[in-house]
Amino acid sequence: MSAICVDSVFLLGLYDDRDQYHARANELFVAYFNNIFNRLLVPWPVLYETVSTRLVRHQKNLALFERDWRRLTGRGQLILLDDSPYRQAAIDECFSEVRVQRRESRALSLADRVIRHMLGETKIKVDVLITFNVADFADVCRRLRLHLVS
């Protein structure tokens, strides 16, 4: 059984058939989560970014999201990760970018910074990260020896 964390770019691609990553996201979802032994780890900030106005305006897409949500929950495969222990450090990192030369700064969203902190947390077991923003996570995955899938 693998613990697989995802970011919002993956979920947005999965539930929007017009998204450039839709086909690949669907392929990965089938490969990893039709297997009842894998668990889907979703940090709360990922949900806030995914269940956006864009998603809720398209009932068909929201219905697909709900279907998968209920199926994974029913199988015990869906784990929601509390971000509260990581919020302050993540926002402090965002603000510290103001004091860094532009070419040395990292333009990472608050949600991505929270995910990066969660990946390094020893209390949270993560085996795989699925993202289409490889550059935002390659260093931390390499350092922690996590499998990065895109």
Short names for language-model regions:
Residues 1-23:
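Metal-dependent nucleic-acid phosphoesterase active-site entry motif
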Residues 5-6, 27-58, 70, 80-82:
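PIN/NYN-family metal-dependent endoribonuclease catalytic core
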Residues 6-9, 71-73, 92-99:
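Short, basic/glycine-rich phosphate-binding loops at helix/coil junctions
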Residues 9-10, 45, 135:
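Alpha-helix/helix-capping structural signal
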Residues 15, 54, 141:
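Short, flexible helix/strand-to-coil boundary loops that buttress conserved ligand/catalytic motifs
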